[in-house]
Amino acid sequence: LENRVAEKQKLFQEDNGLPVHLKGGATDN
């Protein structure tokens, strides 16, 4: 599970150019 989250964050960073936590990582929940 932790790996999947890391991958999501990675894709999110590449897609938006910003860390997930900066955009409000609540979207992942």
Curated annotation (Swiss-Prot):
GO annotation terms (biological process): mitochondrial electron transport, cytochrome c to oxygen; mitochondrial respirasome assembly; regulation of oxidative phosphorylation
Any one Gene Ontology molecular-function term assigned to this protein's record: oxidoreductase activity
Main localization of the protein described in the UniProt heading: mitochondrion
Compartment(s): Mitochondrion inner membrane
Gene3D superfamilies assigned to the protein according to its UniProt record, in alphabetical order: Cytochrome c oxidase, subunit VIIa
UniProt key word Lipid biosynthesis: no
Membrane topology annotation: Single-pass membrane protein
Ranges where the record places region Disordered: 1-29
Pathway: Energy metabolism; oxidative phosphorylation
Keywords for the protein's UniProt record, in alphabetical order: Membrane, Mitochondrion, Mitochondrion inner membrane, Oxidoreductase, Transmembrane, Transmembrane helix
Annotated Basic and acidic residues bias: 1-13
Superkingdom to which the source organism belongs: Eukaryota
GO cellular component: mitochondrial inner membrane; respiratory chain complex IV
Quaternary structure (record): Component of the complex IV (CIV, cytochrome c oxidase), a multisubunit enzyme composed of 14 subunits. The complex is composed of a catalytic core of 3 subunits MT-CO1, MT-CO2 and MT-CO3, encoded in the mitochondrial DNA, and 11 supernumerary subunits COX4I1 (or COX4I2), COX5A, COX5B, COX6A2 (or COX6A1), COX6B1 (or COX6B2), COX6C, COX7A1 (or COX7A2), COX7B, COX7C, COX8B and NDUFA4, which are encoded in the nuclear genome.
Similarity section: Belongs to the cytochrome c oxidase VIIa family.
Main function: Component of the mitochondrial respiratory complex IV (CIV, also named cytochrome c oxidase complex), the last enzyme in the mitochondrial electron transport chain which drives oxidative phosphorylation. The CIV complex is the component of the respiratory chain that catalyzes the reduction of oxygen to water. Acts as an assembly factor that specifically drives the homodimerization of CIV complexes, mediating the formation of mitochondrial respiratory supercomplexes (respirasomes) containing two CIV: supercomplxes with two molecules of CIV show improved activity.
Name under which the protein is recorded: Cytochrome c oxidase subunit 7A1, mitochondrial
Species this chain originates from: Ovis aries (Sheep)
